[in-house]
Amino acid sequence: MNTYISLNEVLVLAQKALDCHLKQVPRKKILFQGIVNTGETLTLCSPQPKMHPQGFYWVDITEEQARVLNETDTGLLFFRLEGRNLLMIKWTDLKRYLTDACVRYNANEQYHWKLNIYKDHIKISGNANEMPVELMHYTSAE
């Protein structure tokens, strides 16, 4: 049984809450953009972190994802976690923790930041600071 919120469910939730139609960014599976009623642009990034054997989630935020999120008026990240939990954060809040000293590189993701997600905070590999967060349990878009 899949206990993760689907990407489609996230889109329905976000579009309803933000009163905005979101379209997929070309060639980007988890990035969506729209224009809210104020005329500002909105970008949503919704990765599905993996559970680490040590009991936290991990996900990479790539330099390309960061570029797209930086080019919008409002950037939001909706992390889809096991147990139908959702973690929603503003890009401007997260990017303060994504320093140049924390950047990693590999052939697959290229330049990226590695995020470790816990129930009450996010830890970026290479950064001693933690970002406090609060998980939300998702039941349905109704």
What are these regions (language model features)?
Residues 4-5, 92-142:
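Non-catalytic C-terminal interaction segments of nucleic acid-processing enzymes
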Residues 30-32, 77, 113:
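Residue-level detector of beta-strand structural context in well-folded domains
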